[in-house]
């Protein structure tokens, strides 16, 4: 009997099974691998309530995608939870909150840590697949950048610590409390 215990929910054919038909299962698995590296959209919130999306065993499913755009036909009235099942899947996902109602969605997998994604934002997450206690973690929460880093546009940064020389071309607006700052005009 085939099983689906892997992280991509692919069909694992038992030795000796599917004599003469294994090619169909293999082709489906290859299509699902391609799906897992792509982009997909799913209306996860057809109603204004917490929801679960399940990565299907051995068949196409939007939640299998690496980049997963979450939408809603319902207007969300408050922060809503989206549980990604099964809770044994360990993987990395980019999840975009494209829901209506200007609400945050909370991504969860089990009773462990969760990640909030504000409306209009995308986060890179990893699901640890630890079963009932599974956690979802923001993969970029503690990213360090060495060397030259360039940022364009307008943004808000909280809790920023800079060391070394910081060069700005254009306007730089700082607020809050500054300490130990030495400014040099170019």
Where are these regions (language model features)?
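Residues within well-ordered beta-strands of beta-sheet-rich folds
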Residues: 94, 124-126
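Tight coil/turn sites that cap or link beta-strands
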Residues: 119-122
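Exposed extracellular interaction/assembly regions and N-terminal maturation sites
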Residues: 1-9, 13-105, 186
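Surface-exposed, low-helix, low-complexity loop/repeat segments of extracellular attachment proteins
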Residues: 46-50, 59, 67-73, 103-108, ...
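Short beta-strand micro-motifs enriched in acidic
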Residues: 126-128, 165
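Extracellular beta-strand-rich, repetitive "passenger/adhesive" scaffolds
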Residues: 130-133
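Short acidic-glycine-tyrosine-enriched beta hairpin
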Residues: 113-117
């Amino acid at each position: 009997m085939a099983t689906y215990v892997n992280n991509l929910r692919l069909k694992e054919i038992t030795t000796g099974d599917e004599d003469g038909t294994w090619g169909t299962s293999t082709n489906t698995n290859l299509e699902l691998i391609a799906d897992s590296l792509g982009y997909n959209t799913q209306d996860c919130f057809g109603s204004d309530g917490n929801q679960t999306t399940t990565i299907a065993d051995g068949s196409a499913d939007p939640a299998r995608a690496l980049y997963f755009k979450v939408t809603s036909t319902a207007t969300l009235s408050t922060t809503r939870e989206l549980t990604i099942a099964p809770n044994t899947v360990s993987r990395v996902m980019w999840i975009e909150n494209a829901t209506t109602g200007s609400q945050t969605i909370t991504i969860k997998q089990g009773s462990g840590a969760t990640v909030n994604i504000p409306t209009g934002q995308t986060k890179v997450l990893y699901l640890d697949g630890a079963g009932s206690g599974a956690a979802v973690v923001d993969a970029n929460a503690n990213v360090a950048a060495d060397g030259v880093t360039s940022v364009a546009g307008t943004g808000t940064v909280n809790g920023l610590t800079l060391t070394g020389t910081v060069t700005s071309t254009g306007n730089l607006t700082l607020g809050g409390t500054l300490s130990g700052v030495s400014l040099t005009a170019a």
